[in-house]
UniProtKB/Swiss-Prot annotation:
Reaction(s) this enzyme catalyzes, per UniProt: (2R)-2-phosphoglycerate = (2R)-3-phosphoglycerate
Cofactor note: Binds 2 manganese ions per subunit.
Keyword Isomerase: yes
Pathway assigned to this chain's UniProt record: Carbohydrate degradation; glycolysis; pyruvate from D-glyceraldehyde 3-phosphate: step 3/5
Domain of life the protein comes from: Bacteria
Protein function: Catalyzes the interconversion of 2-phosphoglycerate and 3-phosphoglycerate.
Gene Ontology BP terms: glucose catabolic process; glycolytic process
UniProt-recorded name of the protein: 2,3-bisphosphoglycerate-independent phosphoglycerate mutase
Active site: 64 (phosphoserine intermediate)
Length: 514
């Protein structure tokens, strides 16, 4: 007969941040006798769930995807934006073999280096600092013909904010004594993601043929003309930038084309127009055989060079459990099921050996303020049964309420959501203690603790950059360590289970057994 297992349970209360101020704080306002007692009587600490500590830009609020990747990886996982910032800062970017190789090949053949991307400080799809670094790389590596094709933002930035960015690049090219802005067009055309190929075609023709609806001597003049036509940045029509006497920047076979967007979804369509031999989105007037480089991998089936391939995570918590012949369960509602499976496993879709999954359907309501408890009762029932089954070495569970109801901005509903969670935590803690298991309670980021924006007085529906609680429930005598972050959770669990921590995990245990 197999011995009943005493599980190590991780409960993630999504959107359950820690904030001292009581005003507009749904977590403070709710009646939470169970969490209050655990915080008062059990080993606990606060951990960081935002900004650089989770691989995001400094002070940027956390999110569920990033949070769960860090929780499962046991190391800080840098997001593309931050990864590139770090690479540029330490100059590794300038030695990137794919980028440098494309520039050298074009330069040695007397060809042009074309750089395209969303010229924006928004940091969502791209960052203009990365594009500036690419211009510098091309110049440093001896390229003479450097053409920048600027896609204008106005969605992740104010609607008319491109002028300062374009000025900066025109000044840079003047200082270098070579290169220029060769075209401008709104992201509405160049970055479609809904197969509106008539839009993409306008951007493609602008790039390949150096033909557009409008022409201007300078990028700033072209932008000002667009504003005079009542076009905001996002909708600027295809504009060729070419002063008298300048050669046109039409693309030729053998040119290098480097796409500086790091986010994939709005980069795929125009990339396929250049790369796919069997492309049929529109009839291309000119097919050019360029040396196309994607900054990151936009899709696995796009066969062209990638400067920064996806970093595969080795020995995440789930993989390490499987390698050590441990059994594990992942359980949540629909809203956060992908987070405790795909994201917690470091972007791996398939379950590991010994990994079971339970999906509880989230309620079918228009918005979750209408049913703030969501499906927490059913989720708790299934979770408690799994804890008592003796089948699992470890269980990962996410309760979505704090986040999903927090997003509605309805304070009364968020309070009810938090109160429902308190009852759930009580049941789970009792079950864990009844079988001699261990329980960690934490969150992936904040939300419900800030329900009103103090600056505007409007409902606050976004995540926060505040810390989140971490509580230990179990029979071990442990001491909490301060200064932790989400990537310390997996090593903490392994340490409490008496298991070796793989060397890839750089996080540190936050509860030390005394």
């Amino acid at each position: 007969m197999s011995v009943s297992k005493k599980p190590m349970v991780l409960v993630i209360l999504d959107g359950y941040g820690y904030r001292e101020e009581q005003q507009d704080n749904a977590i403070f306002s709710a009646k939470t006798p169970v969490m209050d007692a655990l915080w008062a009587n059990r080993p606990h600490t606060l951990i960081d769930a935002s900004g650089l500590e989770v691989g995001l830009p400094d002070r940027q609020m956390g999110n569920s995807e990033v949070g769960h990747v860090n929780l499962g990886a046991g190391r800080i996982v840098y997001q593309d934006l931050t990864r590139l910032d770090v690479e540029i800062k330490d100059r590794a970017f300038f030695a990137n073999p794919v980028l440098a190789g494309a520039v050298h090949k074009a330069k040695n053949a007397g060809k042009a280096v074309h750089i395209m991307g969303l010229l924006s400080a928004g940091g969502v799809h791209s960052h203009e600092d990365h594009i500036m670094a690419m211009v510098e790389l091309a110049a440093e590596r001896g390229a003479e013909k450097i053409y920048l094709h600027a896609f204008l933002d106005g969605r992740d930035t104010p609607p008319r904010s491109a002028e300062s960015s374009l000025k900066k690049f025109e000044e840079k090219f003047a200082a270098l004594g070579k290169g220029r802005v060769a075209s401008i067009i709104g992201r509405y055309y160049a970055m479609d993601r809904d197969n509106r190929w008539d839009r993409v075609e306008k951007a493609y023709d602008l790039l390949t043929l150096a033909q557009g609806e409008f022409q201007a001597d300078t990028a700033v003049a072209g932008l000002q003309a667009a504003y005079a036509r009542d076009e905001n940045d996002e909708f600027v029509k295809a504009t060729v930038i070419r002063a008298e006497g300048q050669p046109d920047a039409a693309m030729e076979d053998g040119d290098a084309l480097i796409f500086m967007n790091f986010r994939a979804d709005r980069a795929r369509e125009i990339t396929r127009a250049f790369v796919n031999a069997d492309f049929d989105g529109f009839a291309r007037k000119k097919v050019v055989n360029v040396d196309f480089v994607m900054l990151t991998e936009y899709a696995a089936d796009i066969k062209t060079a990638v400067a920064y391939p996806p970093a595969s995570l080795v020995n995440t918590f789930g993989e390490w459990m499987a390698k050590n012949d441990k059994t594990q369960l992942r359980i949540s509602e629909t809203e956060k099921y992908a987070h405790v499976t795909f994201f917690f496993n470091g972007g791996v879709e398939e379950s590991f050996k010994g990994e079971d999954r339970i999906l509880i359907n989230s309620p079918k309501v228009a918005t979750y303020d209408l049913q703030p408890e969501m499906s927490s009762a059913e989720l708790t029932e299934k979770l408690v049964a799994a804890i008592k089954s003796g089948k699992y070495d470890t269980i990962i569970c996410n309760y979505p309420n704090g986040d999903m109801v927090g997003h509605t901005g309805v304070m009364e509903a968020a309070v009810k959501a938090v109160e429902a969670l308190d009852h759930c935590v009580e049941e789970v803690a009792k079950a864990v203690e009844s079988v001699g298991g261990q329980l960690l309670i934490t969150a992936d980021h904040g939300n419900a603790e800030q329900m009103r924006d103090p600056a505007t007085g409007q409902a606050h529906t976004a995540h926060t950059n505040l810390p989140v609680p971490l509580i230990y429930v179990g029979d071990k005598n442990v001491k909490a360590v301060a200064g932790g972050k989400l990537s310390d959770i997996a090593p903490t669990m392994l340490s409490l289970m008496g298991m070796e921590i793989p060397q890839e995990m750089t996080g540190k245990p936050l509860f030390i057994v005394e």
